């Protein structure tokens, strides 16, 4: 049951969930859009489905994250209240939504950690549990990008060599199309240069000029079809895993509210957070999508799959 004391916390959590969806939902499928595997709308639809599924599954898979991001152990015991929880949600959500409006991919976990830290400092700067901050928050945030970079440095060359060994090659394309051509027959004035005449042009294209495909077969399946299918599945798994990770962090604000009395995780809290995340992604993902998919680097299908 939603009470008046819980309402500010609920609004703060939903605000944060909306912001999270707007900034994060598309990240997992950005390689699909950037490589041309799927259109923006198709990629967004796939991201939304995977996000909803991950949010619902998080009820069983991510209980420890609920405890971590409820402020227990970081904020001095007995000082956490509904007003503080609402402020944490609104502050973190506003930070993420501002970055989204600017088209900047950001981390909800970083924003939420900063909001929790700010609340702890306001309540009692001398009572902050710095060991908890370092071990449960700072350490994972610092190590995860380095781990991802290290893995891709090892994985991409290995997969590239495997592709070549299997006889799967990138194919060039021959672009043939009608194009205007200038003609100046004998006895015609120079003014005729401005009169276009139809003609044919032929050019050999590569990734920058036309779509790259993979030639060959893998386990009896067309290589390009296999790469695209695996790419789509990998992008969905990224969105699913992110939702499993992020939903409990946001729901923790609701579950820590005194109005809930520290009860077990209610299904309605997860459902509301999941719906808000999905709605935020559907309505406000475009700017972050363009940044991730178009402005950072060019990716082909294989590179997108490897990145995921």
What are these regions (language model features)?
Residues 31-40, 113-127, 254-262:
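Interfacial segments of multi-pass membrane proteins
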